[in-house]
Amino acid sequence: MNAPQKHSAPITVEVALGDRAYEIVIGRDVIASLGERIAKLRPGARTAIVTDRTVAKTWLKRTEEVLDQVGIAHASVIVGEGESSKSYAGLEQVCEALIAAKIERNDLVIALGGGVIGDLAGFSASLLRRGVDFVQVPTSLLAQVDSSVGGKTGINSPQGKNLIGTFHQPVLVLADTAILDTLSPRQFRAGYAEVAKYGALGDEAFFAWLEANHAELFSGGAAREHAVATSCRAKAAIVARDERETGDRALLNLGHTFGHALEAATGFSDRLFHGEGVAIGMVLAAEFSAERGMMPAADAQRLAKHLADVGLPTRLQDIAGFTQEGLADADRLMALMSQDKKVKRGELTFILMEGIGRAVIANKVEPAPVRDFLQRKLAQA
């Protein structure tokens, strides 16, 4: 893979969806162009900024300023932090606030936050007046490389993650890499799991580049922009050919079947961030693949080593409070995975691996080998 170049101008990636195509704009301080871009996209539109309390303290004023500079009217909706806001109560709060702000069909909702805010604001926009357009301004690494791109929106159910939702594409994504400087190390690492996922599922050269350059990526600079842009290009290409996840878009769920079950088992709490669940889930998927003879054991070890090298959890016992609340229970994890969105006619579908950069969709996976695998992993704790 070529070394990243220093960019004096933002990088633009197109999500090619015909008349619903949109741009992902990546670079430092691209948020400064938000007002001008909205004015061109929707002349005369009013806006509502949906964000959480933490992001509001740092970025709401700046966002309001760039809208004020071009005379765009704006309201603000502030919700609590974390997965607990991706709920029926959170959805009601946002929808009622948007209605009270008189946001109409020709107006715009701005999702200013991480993956939770993007999912919640996008879902609310998709329902409001049967569909209002929205803009993603992702403020976490995970959101910039994954959840802000592709149009998946939704909330969680007590029975599982993202079980209630819609496909609703944004009209613009602004990925300001300067915002990532404000993330905690743990938040940044969690987002990095999704970056590594793109290499693991379909681009061995990118994975090797990450192994060699992750320190520079974590410190900022051109490597960070390069990683975000490469990740967005990979996702945009898959979304363009399979928007509704009827085919190979499911590959983007590498690590998510195990990971979502672990998130649900921990109550969608900060005991396990989404990216951390994905990291453990990818390692479990790789190890399960190796046990089935699909993937060299050395590749599974290589994946686990890289994720551990950057400080991500890679084992079930790395989860805080591992033995609490029934987490160390294979039957409970199997029950949670049975609610996975990829399940078809009650049969499990997993994203497994044939090697680094070669993920495959495995349909009709028998539950008994999965349960046995989990029981053995749990016994190692």
From Swiss-Prot:
Tell me where the signal peptide lies: none
| Principal place of residence | cytoplasm
The Gene Ontology biological process annotation of the record reads:
amino acid biosynthetic process; aromatic amino acid family biosynthetic process; chorismate biosynthetic process
Source domain of life = Bacteria
Q: Which cofactor does it need?
A: Co(2+); Zn(2+); NAD(+)
Query: What subcellular locations does the record give?
Result: Cytoplasm
Membrane-crossing residue ranges in chain numbering: none
The enzyme class is lyase
- A GO molecular function for this record? metal ion binding
Keywords, A to Z, come to: Amino-acid biosynthesis, Aromatic amino acid biosynthesis, Cobalt, Cytoplasm, Lyase, Metal-binding, NAD, Nucleotide-binding, Zinc
SUPFAM superfamilies noted in UniProt: Dehydroquinate synthase-like (SSF56796)
Reactions mediated catalytically: 7-phospho-2-dehydro-3-deoxy-D-arabino-heptonate = 3-dehydroquinate + phosphate
Q: Which GO terms describe its cellular component?
A: cytoplasm
Q: In which pathway does it act?
A: Metabolic intermediate biosynthesis; chorismate biosynthesis; chorismate from D-erythrose 4-phosphate and phosphoenolpyruvate: step 2/7
Q: What is its EC number?
A: 4.2.3.4
Cite the NCBIfam families for this sequence.
aroB
Give the family per the record: Belongs to the sugar phosphate cyclases superfamily. Dehydroquinate synthase family.
This protein is called 3-dehydroquinate synthase
Species name: Rhodopseudomonas palustris (strain TIE-1)
